[in-house]
A protein has these predicted regions:
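Iron-sulfur-cluster electron-transfer modules
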Residues: 1-164
Length: 166
């Protein structure tokens, strides 16, 4: 379960299933019953701000994605109207989604940027039930958006990014 909430939208009883899963995972986290792979991702996110890659690697990753798809993807602009975020897979295996977003922003003339300070919207803390980490990662996105003057945070369709950011 990615806690995307799609099941909730079709539940005939109106039960917020994703919220139930979130609460169950939080209880398991508090009890120390997180699977080791998720615990490893939790530790990486605490250190790097992402379970998959350190923020300092973001400029090089975006440069590679830009070359691969022939579209500029701004990184670390001091001012931007839109903070662009991604799920880890969009920075490695599924770069077309990120390139498509960059093409749309470039075509419409919107000033968007990804930023080392807050770029990963997947929020492993939300997935693991680690509420402290969830808040830290969400706060990084919000603080980065405020820092660069962004009025919009563009979230990926990773399943639970919106729920985590809310």
């Amino acid at each position: 379960c990615t806690m995307c909430g799609r099941c909730t939208t079709v539940c005939p009883m109106g039960i917020d299933i994703a919220e139930l899963v979130k609460e169950a995972r939080h209880g398991m986290f508090v009890a120390g019953l997180v699977p080791e792979r998720l615990a490893l991702m939790d530790r990486a996110a605490r250190q790097w701000g992402s379970p998959a890659t350190p923020g300092e690697d973001l400029p090089d990753i975006l440069d590679e994605v830009s070359k691969q798809h022939g579209v500029p993807i701004p990184c670390d602009l001091e001012r931007a109207d839109i903070l662009v975020t991604a799920a880890p897979a969009e920075l490695s295996d599924h770069t077309k989604a990120l390139a498509a977003a960059a093409k749309i922003l470039n075509r419409t003339g919107e000033r968007g940027t990804m930023h080392q300070g807050g770029f990963d919207a997947s929020n492993i803390g939300f997935n693991n039930g680690d509420l402290e980490l969830q808040e830290k990662l969400t706060r990084a996105l919000v603080d980065t958006a405020v820092k660069i003057g962004a009025k919009t945070v563009l979230l990926p369709e990773c399943g639970h990014a919106y729920g985590a950011a809310r």
